[in-house]
Amino acid sequence: MFGFIHESIRQLVIRNYGEDTWTQVLERSGFESGKENIMNHYYSDTDTYVLVDSVSLVLKVTKDQVWEMYGGFLITYSMEIGWDELVRSMSPNLKGFLDNLDSLHYFIDHVVYKANLRGPSFRCEETPDGTLLLHYFTGRPGLYHIVKGVVKEVAKRVFDLDITLVVQGRTQRSVHMNNGERVEEHVVFLINNLSEPRRDSEGSEVSLLTSTNANFPTIVDDTLGISLDDFSKALPYHFVIDESCKLVQCGSELHNHIPNELLQPGTPILRIFEINRPQIPLDFENICNFINAVFVLQVKTSPLKKKHMDAMSQEELKQEMETLDEDATNELTQGHHLKLKGQMMLLASKKHIIYLCSPYVTSINELMQYGMRLTAMPLHDATRDLILLNQQRLSDVEVNLQLEANNEQLETMTRELELERQKTDSILKDMLPRRIAQQLLSGEHIEACEHEATVMFCDLPAFQQAIPQCSPKDIVNMLNEIFRKLDRIVVIRGVYKVETVSDSYMAVSGIPDYTPEHAENMCHVALGMMWEARSVIDPVSKTPFLLRIGIHSGTITAGVVGTVHPKYCLFGETVTLASQMESLGMAGKIQCSKWAYQKAMETGRFEFSPRGRIDVKQRGLTETYFLTRSLKKSIWEIIDHDRDINVNSIEGYEELETAIENAVTIKSALPRPDQRNSAACSIS
């Protein structure tokens, strides 16, 4: 169904029940907000039924009640958005309004929106007692409750009538159409007026329900006559049929679109035309039943193309076919079948019907497709004006469609941009401390400042020896495996990873948020890293990789450097000393400076072994210590893993020390790198 239906349902729910209720309807129906009511979009019937089912469930009313409520609101909403004058000008009474619903429906579908939708048909009958019988035909069974709502609201708002609408009968039948078989529902309503009779200024009763047939004198000049040729030129597209639906006469212009052999008296009309609307079998009785409907007939043949092809030689025809694409070839061989739109009128004899019509052409493009020009239509034919006016309307509709498409594209781009922004923010928060990243995203200026913190460097002493033994891909995989494990420990212990360069890893504790336990935290991180490195195998020694870690505590300067690629950098002697603690350390050992040792022991409890004095650049001989274990936390607490009571010791340090000692022993017994054969890199 057309998007206007969905939009009016949305308006109905929001106005009467609020935005929250409509949100519930969308959630239940599975529609994305903003995609459920695109005005010029055609939704499948299934989509519309799902939407109405959701409204019914959310409002706790039956679907029939929803449809009837919608029918009444449809009139209210349509009159609010600009259709008020048209609705009120259709007829002075309800019968005339209902008899013209077909033409109004056709105009909205085919002219205003150019949708070519499958709409219902209506026909009224007056009864002797002054009531109305409304016949409603539709290819969508079960929607007749909409009609009840529409008719009641029109009677009340337009004609100020209080009516009752009772279903007198409801039948369904299978109808064979050109596009296949479909089920058609026929519902008969009895309409009764409950309002007081109205009278005009002369005191005569005026019926707003049924039509009033006044008998006016007819002026006839018996000497006046019109020849068949004149009549055929005045109405160039008309035809007359008899009770057998056989052709009696036709207009002159039809010969330009239909072969002459078919336009002979006695030719069954079904050989010439197929009916598009109303969707009924094309016979005399059905035409009389739908005498008030708009009839759209389509020519079954296309003689213009046929004449063009017949006039060509076989060689010319073959050459033209070869130069055309598939669509153009189809157009040449099949042609455009002319459509006629007009009114069927039962003549006084009751034995003949005349079809008063015009070509159903609404744009210059269609006019050209039929090989026609404006001169093919009489000056009195309003179709000429319609084509010119509709040409401008089509331009406006095209602009509106483009605007809707642009708006939808803009919304999509906005959502995609938001996703990309979130990704960028996430990357920035990975590159910088979270608080610093948040300040940058908020547009705040980050001032460099001094902090008391603990810096750690670690590397893989055996890494350079492993490079010749591995492919580049294996080297990258090995580093990723190690750094992924180290990153996990850093995150668990609340320490900030500054950077990695080749096999070197740098982290800091106490920045940018100060904590008095910065040295204690960094010592725990170092122990956890030593443990995690055990699971990555050195391809040379076939033993676990041994880390070399150096830690130093002191004052450092930290700040954000760069704008395009911002980086959180650390400066000062503390960074230099921490780097030397690592470079002057030993594989499998965590070397701490005297200041890191003192800071760690202030808040934590650790076991250190003195290394003695080492010569540190710019500091001379400096006291250092090897960290062996924490007396406050077990390995399992540090790495946040459960202990296997059947395998592991309570603290875990025995396994760590044993693994390190074994790896050191094996590595020390290996020959120098230039004496070894190459080996493959393995990661466990």
Swiss-Prot record:
Expressed in a small number of neurons, corresponding to URX, AQR and PQR neurons. May be regulated by molecular oxygen. Probably not activated by nitric oxide (NO). Mg(2+) binds at D459, D503. Residues 454-582 form the Guanylate cyclase domain. Heme binds at H105. Binds 1 or 2 heme groups per heterodimer. Residues 396-432 form a coiled coil. One of its GO terms (biological process) is response to oxygen levels. Its EC number is 4.6.1.2. Disruption phenotype: No response to varying levels of oxygen. Significantly reduced aggregation and bordering behaviors. Synthesizes cyclic GMP (cGMP) from GTP. Influences aerotaxis responses, aggregation and bordering behaviors (gathering around the edge of a bacterial lawn) in combination with other soluble guanylate cyclases. Heterodimer; with other soluble guanylate cyclases. There are two types of guanylate cyclases: soluble forms and membrane-associated receptor forms. This is Soluble guanylate cyclase gcy-32.
